[in-house]
C-alpha cells in the first residue's frame, strides 16, 4: 500500500563510514513518521539493529492507531471507548475487515454468514479425543485451528472473495473451537452452535449449557463479554499479530497462520498476563498486605513483580483498562459480589496506592488491560485456563484483518529479518579422533 501523504518527501541523513545517505521520511496520517531504511543494506553494506523491533515499522496499516503517551487507541479512526460503549463485537469485526461501519443490511448479511459458518467438520471431534484430559485448552485450540488447514487445503491462491470468506470462516469457527476445547478439558459433551443466539450469547451457551440443561445468558454478563471482546480485538503490530503476518507473508494457509498467532498469544508475557494478575492478587491475599508487596515490587533483588501494571506501548493509563474497571464493577454488582469480592477490593486499593507512588509515576506504570479482565472472567465462572482462549477469540478479528490487509498490499514481501552475527569466524573441520 502506498501512503498518500508522501508526495513531497523529506529526507533524513545518515553518515556511514564517511559516506552520507539520504533516507526518505514517510509521513504518517497521524503519529510518528517513519524513516525508510529499506535501501541501507544494499547501498551501505550494513544492516540496522533493533532488538525486539521497538523502533521498527514492519508494515503500513490503516487498521489500528495507538498513541501510548496520550492513552489513545483507535480502530479505523474510531475511539475504542466509543466502540466498547456503543457498538457490538461483530460490528467491530466488520469494521476491521472492511474498513467501514456496516449499514443495517450489511450488518445483517455479515452476522448471518458468521452464524452459517459456526459449525466445524464432525471429523474434528476425533482430534479432540487424542488429547489427554489434563491438556490445556490453549494447546487443544492451537491444534484444532491448525487442523482446519486440512479441511480447506485450497486456500493458497487467493482473490478478494477468498479473503473475505476466509475471515468470516475463522471468526465464526474460533468460538466453537474454543468452547469445544473447554468442554473436552472438563469431560463434558460438546454443545453445537445455536443460530438463534448472537455471537457472544452463542459462545456462552456453548461454554455452559449441557445436553440436559439449558443455559440462560444474563444480559449484563453478555454485554460485559461483548465489551471485553471489542477491547481485545486488535492492538496494532504486537507479538502475535506480527507472527500471523510473518507466517502469512510466505503464502501459508490462513488457518495455519492463525494457529501461529495463538501460539504466540499463549506466552505469559502476551496473552497469559490476566491469569498472572489473578494469581498475584491471591498471593497478596488481603488489603493489609498491599504495602508489603508494593515494597517487594520496588526491590530489584526481589523476584516479585506487580502483574497488570505497565505496557510496552502505553506510558499513560491504558484506555481499555479504564473501560474494564467500570465493567468489572457492573458485573460484580449484578452478581451480588461488588462489596464482598476480595480480589476486586485488593485490585482497587492496589491501583490507588500505585497511582500515588512516585516509583510507579516516574516509571509510567499504570494498570493495563489485563488488570481487571481476569476478575471479570472469574466472576463469570470462566476458569483461569480459559482466559487466554477468550483473548484468542477476540484477537482473531484483528489477526484476520491484518492478514487480509497484508495480502492486499502491493508492496508485501516475504518477511526476512536479518541478524548481527557474533559467532565464530571460519574454523577448520577436524575428524573426531583429532578432537580433544
UniProtKB/Swiss-Prot annotation:
Keywords: Acyltransferase, Transferase, Tricarboxylic acid cycle. The keyword Translocase does not apply. Its EC number is 2.3.3.16. SUPFAM superfamilies: Citrate synthase (SSF48256). Coiled coil: none annotated. Gene3D superfamilies: 2.20.28.60, Citrate Synthase, domain 1, Cytochrome P450-Terp, domain 2. It comes from the Bacteria. It catalyses: oxaloacetate + acetyl-CoA + H2O = citrate + CoA + H(+). GO terms for molecular function: citrate (Si)-synthase activity. Pathway: Carbohydrate metabolism; tricarboxylic acid cycle; isocitrate from oxaloacetate: step 1/2. GO terms for biological process: tricarboxylic acid cycle. It is an enzyme of class 2 (transferase). The active site is at 311, 370. GO terms for cellular component: cytoplasm. The keyword Acyltransferase applies. InterPro entries: Citrate_synth-like_lrg_a-sub (IPR016142), Citrate_synth-like_sm_a-sub (IPR016143), Citrate_synthase (IPR002020), Citrate_synthase_AS (IPR019810), Citrate_synthase_bac-typ (IPR024176), Citrate_synthase_sf (IPR036969), Citrate_synthase_typ-I (IPR010953). It holds the Pfam family Citrate_synt. Citrate synthase is found in nearly all cells capable of oxidative metabolism. Belongs to the citrate synthase family. This is Citrate synthase. It comes from Rickettsia typhi (strain ATCC VR-144 / Wilmington).
Amino acid at each position: 500500500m502506498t501512503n498518500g501523504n508522501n508526495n513531497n518527501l523529506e529526507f533524513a541523513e545518515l553518515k556511514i563510514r564517511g559516506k552520507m545517505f539520504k533516507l526518505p521520511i514517510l509521513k504518517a496520517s497521524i503519529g510518528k513518521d517513519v524513516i525508510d531504511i529499506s535501501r541501507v543494506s544494499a547501498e551501505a553494506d550494513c544492516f540496522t539493529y533493533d532488538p525486539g523491533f521497538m523502533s521498527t515499522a514492519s508494515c503500513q496499516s490503516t487498521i489500528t492507531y495507538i498513541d501510548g503517551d496520550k492513552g489513545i487507541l483507535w480502530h479505523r479512526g474510531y475511539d475504542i471507548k466509543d466502540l466498547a460503549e456503543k457498538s457490538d463485537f461483530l460490528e467491530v469485526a466488520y469494521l476491521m475487515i472492511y474498513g467501514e461501519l456496516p449499514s443495517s443490511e450489511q450488518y445483517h448479511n455479515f452476522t448471518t454468514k458468521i452464524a452459517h459458518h459456526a459449525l466445524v467438520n464432525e471429523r474434528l471431534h476425533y482430534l479432540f479425543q487424542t488429547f489427554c484430559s489434563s491438556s490445556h485448552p490453549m494447546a487443544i485450540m492451537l491444534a484444532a485451528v491448525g487442523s482446519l488447514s486440512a479441511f480447506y487445503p485450497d486456500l493458497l491462491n487467493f482473490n478478494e472473495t477468498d479473503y473475505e470468506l476466509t475471515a468470516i470462516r475463522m471468526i465464526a469457527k474460533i468460538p466453537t473451537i474454543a468452547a469445544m476445547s473447554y468442554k473436552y478439558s472438563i469431560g463434558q459433551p460438546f454443545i453445537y452452535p445455536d443460530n438463534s443466539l448472537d455471537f457472544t450469547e452463542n459462545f456462552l451457551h456453548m461454554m455452559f449449557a449441557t445436553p440436559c440443561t439449558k443455559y440462560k445468558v444474563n444480559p449484563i454478563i453478555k454485554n460485559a463479554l461483548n465489551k471485553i471482546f471489542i477491547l481485545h480485538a486488535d492492538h496494532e503490530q504486537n507479538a502475535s499479530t506480527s507472527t500471523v503476518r510473518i507466517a502469512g507473508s510466505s503464502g501459508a494457509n490462513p488457518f495455519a497462520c492463525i494457529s501461529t498467532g495463538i501460539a504466540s498469544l499463549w506466552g505469559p508475557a502476551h496473552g497469559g498476563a490476566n491469569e498472572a494478575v489473578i494469581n498475584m492478587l491471591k498471593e497478596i491475599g488481603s488489603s493489609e498486605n498491599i504495602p508489603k508487596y508494593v515494597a517487594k515490587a520496588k526491590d530489584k533483588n526481589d523476584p516479585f513483580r506487580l502483574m497488570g501494571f505497565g505496557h510496552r506501548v502505553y506510558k499513560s493509563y491504558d484506555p481499555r483498562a479504564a473501560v474494564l474497571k467500570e465493567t468489572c464493577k457492573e458485573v460484580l454488582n449484578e452478581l451480588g459480589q461488588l462489596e464482598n469480592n476480595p480480589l476486586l477490593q485488593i485490585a482497587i486499593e492496589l491501583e490507588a496506592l500505585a497511582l500515588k507512588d512516585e516509583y510507579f509515576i516516574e516509571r509510567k506504570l499504570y494498570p493495563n488491560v489485563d488488570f481487571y479482565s481476569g476478575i471479570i472472567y472469574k466472576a463469570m465462572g470462566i476458569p483461569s485456563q480459559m482466559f487466554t482462549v477468550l483473548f484468542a477469540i477476540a484477537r482473531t478479528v484483528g489477526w484476520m484483518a491484518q492478514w487480509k490487509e497484508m495480502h492486499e498490499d502491493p508492496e508485501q514481501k516475504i518477511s526476512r529479518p536479518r541478524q548481527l552475527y557474533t559467532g565464530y569466524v571460519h574454523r577448520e573441520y577436524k575428524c573426531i579422533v583429532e578432537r580433544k
